[in-house]
Structures are given as C-alpha cells and as structure tokens.
Design a protein with these regions (language model features):
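Hydrophobic alpha-helical transmembrane bundles of multi-pass membrane proteins
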Residues: 1-287
Length: 287
C-alpha cells in the first residue's frame, strides 16, 4: 500500500504534469491570467509544449491520461511479477475477480461518468458536445458487443471479463478523437479498441505478465490505438493543426512514442529504486 501511495505521488506530481505540458499546455495555460503575469515578469516561461507545437492532438486524454497510467501499470507488474500460483498448471483459469457483479456495476458507473469526462473536456456547452456524447456512447456500446461476440466465439458463452474489457477499451479509444470523428468512425474505433485490448490481454497471459485489473490492455493498448486513430480518421478541419493526413499520423506516432518511452522508463526506474529499499510486494505468507 505504501508503494502504491508513493507511485501515486510520483505519477501525479512528476509524470502527468510533464506530459500534460508537452501536449496540452497551449490549450489550457494560455487561459490563465497568472501565466501571462509570470511571462511578463520573467520573460522565460514557455506556455506551449513541444508536442502541441508539432500539432499532436489528444482531445480528452487517450494517451495523456490513459496510456500514461497503462505504462506505469506495465512497469509495476513487471517489477512485481505474477501472483503465486497464477500460471501454474493446477491453477490456470482459477484466478478470477471476487465479484463480477460489482465489477460490471463499476463498469456501468465508469461508462456514465465518461460522458462528463469527454463532454467536459470541451470546456464549453456548445454544439460540439452532443457529437462528443454520441461518439462516446457508440464506441463503448460497440466495444461491449465486440467483447460479447469474441467471448461467444472463444468460450461458447458470455465471459464477464471480456464483457467488461470491451466497453472500457472502446471508451478509452474514443477519448482522443471524440470531438473530431463521425459517428460511424467512432463505432469502428470502439470495435478495434476492444479487439486490441482483448488481444493484448491474451499476449500478457502468454508471457505470464500478471495484470490483475486489465490496466495495460484497456488503458495502454486502447489508448495508443485511439490516439493513432485521430490521425487516421479525424476531420482535419476540426483538428486545425495545419497538417495533412500523413503528417498528422506521423505526429500522433511521435507523441505516442515520446510519452510512452518517458513514462515507462521513468516509472520503471522510480519503482525499481523504491523496491530495493521498501519492497512493493507483500510477503509470501501475507499473499
């Protein structure tokens, strides 16, 4: 628990502010009079981040919020290792959540809250908000249907984990471009996001990387896809970056790689150092 608290402080105090400045500073800092006053006094503070200057777009945070959390989670689970017996032949398939009904309820609450998350990121109640809300719903709904379909194809029955994974991946994926895509495109983004998340979850299990809550498939993988989808499918006139389609895709990839590399490397180093002095994992007896 102490390790979790330390990482939370490091993430919110160091990692998130840095990547947030890289990509969002031109959108937010310029609105505050205090920043203008600081500029007038010092003349040295740069209000725009380098990714923002390049034209990187992540409307509500598929990468800046979700993938960052996913990269931190990946570093943590690699350092911690799998739970005892998780991948033994005797226990395969037996490590499940304690209450799937509560997990599904939590998913529905998240889904509802996402309307405020994406809609509120617009900063104003204007004609853009209905499109944002519709796209958010469609991506989640078709992510759910995709998870359900894959579950039936694989297990011949609905699997709660896939049903939870699908809509959450759709929500994460559409977050970056919910204001600049058509409704049909948002459906496609949600479907592909769910497929990617489920695939990544299987890959993690194959390599015995124990991600208990599916943070890496949902937040990292679907977040990367959603950010790339902005370059692939968003209306360039709405993005208003002055870039053509190919250039926008290139800048999105640069942003994904830069933020991912910085977040994973810094969090892995910080967690490894902390783990040397204060073990992140409980003792085998406690576990």
């Amino acid at each position: 628990f102490n390790g979790y608290l330390i990482m939370t402080v490091l993430a919110t105090g160091i990692i998130y502010p840095i990547v947030g400045h890289w990509a969002w500073s031109s959108s937010y800092l310029s609105k505050y009079e205090a920043v203008d006053q600081l500029l007038a006094i010092t003349g040295t503070v740069k209000t725009t981040g380098w990714l923002s200057d390049l034209g990187f777009v992540d409307f509500a945070g598929s990468t800046i919020v979700h993938s960052v959390g996913g990269w931190i989670a990946l570093a943590a689970v690699i350092i911690l290792g799998p739970r005892i017996g998780k991948y033994s032949d005797a226990n395969r398939g037996k490590f499940t959540g304690s209450s799937f009904p509560l997990a599904v309820l939590g998913t529905l609450i998240l889904w509802f809250g996402w309307f405020g998350f994406n809609g509120g990121s617009n900063g104003a109640m204007d004609e853009t908000v209905p499109l944002i809300l519709i796209n958010t719903f469609l991506a989640a709904a078709f992510g759910l249907l995709t998870g359900l379909t894959i579950s039936y194809l694989k297990f011949k029955k609905p699997d709660p984990f896939y049903i939870i994974l699908g809509p959450l991946a759709g929500l994460v994926a559409i977050t970056a471009g919910c204001n600049s895509m058509t409704s049909v495109t948002s459906i496609f983004v949600g479907i592909i996001g769910a497929i990617i998340a489920i695939t990544v979850n299987e890959i993690l299990n194959k390599f015995e990387i124990d991600d208990v809550v599916g943070a890496v498939p949902v937040h990292l993988a679907a977040g990367v896809w959603g950010t790339l989808a902005v370059g692939l499918f968003s209306d360039l006139t709405i993005l208003d970056t002055g870039l053509d389609r190919f250039s926008q895709i290139k800048i999105q990839l640069i942003g994904i790689f830069a933020i991912g590399a910085f977040t994973f490397i810094s969090s892995y180093i910080l967690l490894s150092l902390y783990n040397k002095f204060f073990p992140l994992r409980v003792s085998p007896v406690q576990e």
